Amino acid sequence: MATRLQFENNCEVGVFSKLTNAYCLVAIGGSENFYSTFETELADYIPVVKTSIAGTRIIGPNVCRNKNGLLVPHTTTDQELQHLRNCLPDSVVVQRIEEKLSALGNCIACNDYVALTHTDLDKETEELIADVLGVEVFGQTIAGNILVGSYCAITNKGGLVHPHTSIEDLDELSTLLQVPLVAGTVNRGSEVI
């Protein structure tokens, strides 16, 4: 089922929420309608957690997640970290990462098996991504863009990549990820996915 939703008149709902097959994160301080829509649709299946990251309502660009784990930036407070650990299922590992590229959601795109990462991430960060999320990690660009998490969204069943991704790159990425991909836009033409 598809539901149209905005966060304070902003259609970029992925900035203010993040969803996996195991849990959903929703920004605190938004309208009750925004949160209640997630709760109505998902609460019977997975926990829906109101949270902030690094004292902000910006969730999507700051976190990297799958059903196995949640990676948060070093700017995440101890209180936020404890709140996430208390609210998420015990099977989900929550890990704060000491990485200078702190907008993890913009730098990493992942599903439950593979992560594509910004090519400048530290090796230690790549190892944490592999360990916490239980994925294979590949440094990659999408249509020449290093912010792979901004220009690619992948699930275990498929993905959407930047509209200027070449056919050759699309085929190579699809083979690497083992899921079908399509090049396109969101929100009436935005290349940032």
UniProtKB/Swiss-Prot annotation:
SMART domains: eIF6. InterPro entries: eIF6. One of its GO terms (cellular component) is nucleolus. Keywords: Cytoplasm, Initiation factor, Nucleus, Protein biosynthesis, Ribosome biogenesis. One of its GO terms (biological process) is cytosolic ribosome assembly. Pfam families: eIF-6. It is found in: Cytoplasm; Nucleus, Nucleolus. GO terms for molecular function: ribosome binding; translation initiation factor activity. It comes from the Eukaryota. Belongs to the eIF-6 family. Binds to the 60S ribosomal subunit and prevents its association with the 40S ribosomal subunit to form the 80S initiation complex in the cytoplasm. May also be involved in ribosome biogenesis. PANTHER family: TRANSLATION INITIATION FACTOR 6. Monomer. Associates with the 60S ribosomal subunit. This is Eukaryotic translation initiation factor 6.
